[in-house]
Amino acid sequence: GLKNLNNMYLIRGLNNIDTFRLSFGHLRFSASIGNFDGLHLGHQHILDSIKASAKEKDFASLVFFTEPHASEYFANISDDDMPPRICPWRDKVKLLSEYGIDFAFFLKFNPSLKRMSPEEFIKNVLEKINIKFLQIGDDFRFGKDRAGDFDLLKNWGDSKDIKVTASKTFKYDGRRVSSTWIRESLQKDNFRLASHLLGRPYTFSGKVVYGQRLGATIGIPTANLWMPKQTLPVKGVYAVKCNLEGTKINGIANMGLRPTVGGKTPV
């Protein structure tokens, strides 16, 4: 359905697009589409553009994002190793809300979306919403076989009086900022570089689940974070800062399996 999260509405799935139109069909939108894994500096550059357009034209800002990532979807159906992601999807939603986006539209990447041609995506998704400004990344592709590109969207926009632009490549130290570069940095434990590319320290959250409570037997509190069907790009033992209800606590994190107790499930 539609959920209000700290002044940002989350629309979950195309099946709720008609409900969304009933509630917000009177609004005009400044929008973007992408995966936005990590919400790094390049993504923030796009979000700044749609927020500026929304403020100038009295539009509402809207971000379409897909879950799972296409590479995760194909890895799951082929039983391959799941590719790592920078942050869980709930963290992504939280970051979009904190960044001041008005609406986040979650598109489930499933067989139906996978088979949708670029023209069908435009008709079934974009034309259902009163978009007046659309900004995409310079490498954005969409639709079946990734056949849709900026030129197709630009031609569509011109025919509908919709301004469609592609962001310029956002670079750091001469290299294009990308989720791939950040994953590589995290896998090499280069947290300083990853933080620069993200524009903030690398963080993640997860649901605390009960373990074997072995730490409690020796006076050391522990917490197991469950990461459902998601692989983070970091593995090993790290010194960390934990945020517990607003209180920061120093701690140690074991990322991956629990080797000391023969664990086989990633935590």
Identify the residue ranges that each predicted region occupies:
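Positively charged, low-complexity intrinsically disordered leader regions
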Residues: 5-33
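Di-metal (Zn2+ and/or Mg2+/Mn2+) metal-binding site signature of metallo-dependent hydrolases
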Residues: 32-50
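Residue-level signal for inorganic ion chemistry
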Residues: 40, 96, 134, 194, ...
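Core alpha/beta nucleotide-donor-binding catalytic domains of modification enzymes
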Residues: 44-129
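Classical nucleotidyltransferase
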Residues: 112-221
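Phosphate/ribose-recognition catalytic cores of enzymes acting on nucleotide-derived substrates
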Residues: 211-267
